[in-house]
């Protein structure tokens, strides 16, 4: 199966913004980051938002905020980047890997449903290569 990926869409405006950020001396937690956090919070109709350096950091923070840790299980797709499973290990929980459905890049939802136990505290679905999981099906199962 050939999965097409698109090249980055970076134009002159994005390049100028990067140059301006580099010239500002602030490339992480400076005023541009704080302004972005305010704008994204407003866009999401919430009081606060926080910028993180990666989806990996975001997933680990989310698991910690949910109180997930030793003794807990978190279900995720076996077909994913290692970070998805490693953040589960970082918080002390046990990853439960679900194979993809035959002919698909999505988790096998029947196997996912059968893997849920009293120790299951979360499911981390994986959208891959532009293919979005069937979240209605996942919500219907949980």
Regions found by a protein language model. Give the residues of each.
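Short alpha-helical
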Residues: 13, 35, 57, 82-83, ...
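Phosphate-binding glycine-rich loop
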Residues: 26-73, 87-91, 97-99
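N-terminal "arm"/small-domain region of PLP-dependent enzymes with the aminotransferase-like
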Residues: 1-27, 31
């Amino acid at each position: 199966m050939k999965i097409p990926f698109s090249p980055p869409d970076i134009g002159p405006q994005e390049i100028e913004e990067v140059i301006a950020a580099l010239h500002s001396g602030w490339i992480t937690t400076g005023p541009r980051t704080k302004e972005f956090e305010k704008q994204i919070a407003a866009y999401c109709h919430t009081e606060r938002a926080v910028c993180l350096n990666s989806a990996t950091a975001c997933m680990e923070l989310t698991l910690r905020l949910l109180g997930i840790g030793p003794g807990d299980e978190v279900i995720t797709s076996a077909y994913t980047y290692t970070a998805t499973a490693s953040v589960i290990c970082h918080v002390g929980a046990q990853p439960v890997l679900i194979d993809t459905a035959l002919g698909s890049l999505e988790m096998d939802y029947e196997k996912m449903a059968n893997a849920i136990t009293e120790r299951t505290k979360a499911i981390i679905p994986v959208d891959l290569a532009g293919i979005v999981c069937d979240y209605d099906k996942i919500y219907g199962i949980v």
